[in-house]
Amino acid sequence: ASDVYKRQNALIVIAVPMTAVGEVLDAIQEHAPSCGITDVVSVKTAVRQQVLERGMESRYVGGHPMAGTSKSGWDNSQRDLFRRAAWGITYDYAAECEARGEKIPKQWIETFTEVVRMTQMVHAEAVPIRVANHDAAVARISHLPHVFAEILAVVGDNGGILAQSLSAGSFKDATRVAGTHPELVQQMCETNAPALVEALDEALDLLRDAREKLDSPEPSIAELSDAGYRARTRIDARSGARKES
């Protein structure tokens, strides 16, 4: 079978929870030792470490499509899920080769090219990125929102039947990802704990400041609401430009 994969220049996409990545890599090492490899796992440092431990870095290019919903399973499949989505593609191995003055292996270049081609096939937009930068960024815009969604859901639920009955747009928007299967959230956040803690500390500083200002003789969150509005406007402008491209 491995000869068939080699002749077809196969690209293997690892799409499993982080806890199963090592087992899948071992199977690839045994059955498809010459195939290019990518993945769609939401944390890149941990996956790359598993790849490095097995000496498979010259045929691995990490990937992460910024798409998905809180639902999972075949029944929740979406035909255009990746359309206009940013798709992070890592290039650490190439950068390290260049830093050492070494030639980048042809297989890695071909694998990188195939990963980019795959993103084009599903109408996503490739974003070259270093592993550490990826994990730091998604800690802020993906993993921290999961933590806050869980917190908001718990606080809202603690309000009892009345709060539950009155919950509507803003609450449901803010807690949507709390509907994600708990094990998936745990693996995602715990695997990226160092970067997530840094983002969480920044968020806690903002929360403490907001609390102090609300607990003053003249309560105000003007500074926070203005900063949040401007930040969201910048984010919308950036993602909007991608959608219109």
What are these regions (language model features)?
Residues 79-177:
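Internal alpha-helical scaffold of NAD(P)-dependent oxidoreductase catalytic cores
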Residues 1-5:
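Short, small-residue-biased leader/transition segments that mark boundaries at the very start
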Residues 233-245:
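Long, positively charged, glycine-interspersed low-complexity recognition regions
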Residues 12-13, 38:
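N-terminal Rossmann-like NAD(P) cofactor-binding module of classical short-chain dehydrogenase/reductase
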Residues 16-18, 41-42, 65, 152:
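Short glycine-/small-residue-rich Rossmann-like dinucleotide-binding loops
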Residues 24-75:
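Rossmann-like NAD(P)(H) cofactor-binding subdomain of soluble oxidoreductases
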Residues 161-232:
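Interdomain hinge/lid region at the active-site interface
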Residues 9:
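An anion/phosphate-binding loop that grips the pyrophosphate of nucleotide cofactors and donors
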